[in-house]
Amino acid sequence: MNKVHMMTAGALALGLLAGCNQGNTLSVTGGEPVSYQCEQGKKVQVRYFSLSDESLSFIKLSLPDGKDYTLPQAVSASGARYTDEHEAVWWNKGDEGFVELRDQDGEWQTAYNDCKQQ
């Protein structure tokens, strides 16, 4: 009897695993570079991405100093906000945005301001 229960449990587990594999395959969409001209002639580049089911949006932020950040979209009252909550934030609304970075004391400081889409 114990052997029958084991075989039934094994068959059930295989059925569940097979069912998990038949879900929709996700892909990443977007990625075209968008350039922004900021104060003092600095340029930042943002690539906007999302999963094909739109469950996640994120960006690749490239700064003039050569640093790159991959930032998921976060809750925002107005416009869009992308942040890792540790080092960088990209805020944008319409054709404009700005970048905040943490300083040595852990405080957010605006690093690139008044950035306008080119």
Show where each model-derived region lies.
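Bacterial N-terminal signal peptides that target proteins for export
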Residues: M1-A9
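C-terminal motif of bacterial Sec signal peptides marking the signal peptidase cleavage site
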Residues: L16-G19
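Bacterial signal peptide processing site
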Residues: N21-G23
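Tryptophan-anchored aromatic micro-motifs
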Residues: G30-V44, Y82
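Short polybasic amphipathic segments
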Residues: V34, L56-L61, A80, E96-Q104
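Mature extracytoplasmic domains of secretory-pathway proteins
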Residues: Q45-R81
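C-terminal partner/receptor-binding element of secreted or periplasmic proteins
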Residues: K93-Q118
